[in-house]
Design a protein with these regions (language model features):
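Conserved polar/disulfide-associated segments of primarily extracytoplasmic proteins
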Residues: 48-179
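N-terminal targeting sequences that direct proteins away from the cytosol to non-cytosolic compartments
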Residues: 1-74, 135-137, 154-158, 168-202
Length: 202
């Protein structure tokens, strides 16, 4: 008789269900023009009233819930980190089974990431950085969005930082989102929707 074994994978809280009212529309009308949907949970414009910062935006609710988004020149160092994170990761194997045992199901693969994130040059208040996940998706205009999910410390608290990266017309569109690690199920859907809402004038 075959004994069914439950795979030893960590249980995650369900991801938050997001709604249109969780976001508001933002557009930068300079060069390069871009627009995207910003999550209200990341707070208010911290650059309001300051001299124009160009095609960059910043929002913050606190020292541990904040985001930036910018249109910049392509950074080959950052591009290399995104690429190497996927190339150099190692799959974490499931423990071997005993005689007459099989897993109830095969879970999604989990990985160890061996790429050093130090060259990313994150803001100084973000420390103890380690890559914990990486992947890619598509925007509404079918641009590739790359993601890096980082475990880090911000303002003395265990946080997650998510980097997003898209390219068009030799420009990079880069996001940085920081939030408490324990609340990642609330924030990751917001980050994903914002990154995939990017539209860039051709």
């Amino acid at each position: 008789m075959i004994k069914k074994i439950k795979p030893p994978v960590p249980e995650e809280k369900p991801l938050r269900v997001i709604w249109p009212q969780d976001f508001y529309y933002y557009s930068y009308n300079g060069d390069p023009y871009y627009s995207l949907s910003l999550p209200k949970d990341f707070g208010t414009d911290t650059l309001a009233g300051l001299p124009a910062a160009g095609p960059m935006l910043m929002r913050a609710q606190s020292n541990t819930v904040l985001m930036t988004f910018a249109a910049t020149e392509n950074d080959p160092v950052k591009n290399r980190i995104f690429s190497e994170a996927l190339k150099n990761r190692s799959e974490i194997p499931l423990p071997p089974l005993g005689p007459n045992e099989e897993y109830e199901y095969i879970p999604a693969p989990r990985y160890t990431y061996n790429t050093d994130p130090a060259p990313l040059e994150l803001p100084k208040q973000i420390t103890n950085v380690k890559i914990v996940d990486a992947g890619s998706g598509r925007t509404a205009e079918n641009l590739i969005v790359q993601y890096l999910y980082l475990s880090c410390t911000a303002d003395g608290q265990h946080c997650m930082a998510v980097l997003t990266h898209s390219e068009r017309n030799q420009k990079a569109f880069d996001g940085l989102f920081v939030f408490p690690y324990a609340e990642k199920q609330n924030y990751i859907p917001l980050v994903t929707f914002t990154a995939q809402s990017l539209r860039v004038r051709k």
